[in-house]
Structure formats: C-alpha cells, structure tokens
Amino acid sequence: MSNDFKVIINGQNIDNGQKIIFEKSQDVPKPIFDIGDNEYYTIAMVDPDAPSRENPIYKYFLHMLIVNNYQTLVSFQPPSPPKGSGYHRYFFFLLKQPKYIDQNIWKQQINNNSIRREKFNLSEFISDNKLTVIASTYFKTKR
C-alpha cells in the first residue's frame, strides 16, 4: 500500500506478495517506516491462513506485535505452516496510533485475552485502540 513501509527479512526487502523459501522466513523481520515528531505506530504480523487457507480456524494467527514504534509487546514467532497446507500469507500492518499508549494498557489486553496469538481479532484490535491502517505488505511461504 505504501512505498514508505518496508519489511526486511534475511537481509532482503520483501515485495508485496513475494514467495519466500521457508527457511529464510524464519529470521526476525525488520519493519522500516518513517516516523514524524510525536507519531506512534503499531506493527502487527498475522497469518490469515492458519492452519490452512481452506480451513482458517485460527485466523488471524498473531506472529508479532510491536507498539509505540519499536516496543515489542508480542515477540516474533516464526512462520510454521503445516506441511501440505500450501502457501500461507503473512501480512504486516502498519497502524498509526492516536498517541503514545502506556505499556500497562496493552498488557491488560493480553491479560484479559483480547490479545492472543490464535484467533487474534485484528479488526477489533484496530477499533478498540483507535488505530488507523497506514500501509500493509505480505509474503507467502510453505513447507
């Protein structure tokens, strides 16, 4: 969606929709984006195809959540599509926050289970935290 938002994996800039060899997808992604004065962003990495595109009962699986620009709230869990489940898409969303949000508020959401890895409700998370989608990109991988 935006040329200003990039994700680097294994030293390579990811093109939207690019297929990546599974082994290379295991490196921690490095999101790169412009930050203005007094601007705060959240980055979510999700898999809408868990455990398969035909039966995505864990949609969205949360692989990583970074808040307040570079504070890790949910640590990176590498892609792990089940063998034989075909290509999985791994989306990165750059979300603008209305302001800096105290870590304790985010941690409360984790404690009440509104932020969890399986069945992460991305739309609700965006709405509840008054976030705005600025950009997104994704890659595909399979085993």
Swiss-Prot record:
Compartments (UniProt record): Virion
A single GO CC term, please? virion component
GO molecular function, a single term? lipid binding
* Keyword Secreted recorded: no
Q: Which residues form a coiled coil?
A: none
Keyword GTP-binding part of the UniProt annotation: no
Give the keywords, sorted. Lipid-binding, Virion
Family as reported in the entry's similarity comment: Belongs to the phosphatidylethanolamine-binding protein family.
What is this protein called in UniProt? Answer: Phosphatidylethanolamine-binding protein homolog R644
Native organism is: Acanthamoeba polyphaga mimivirus
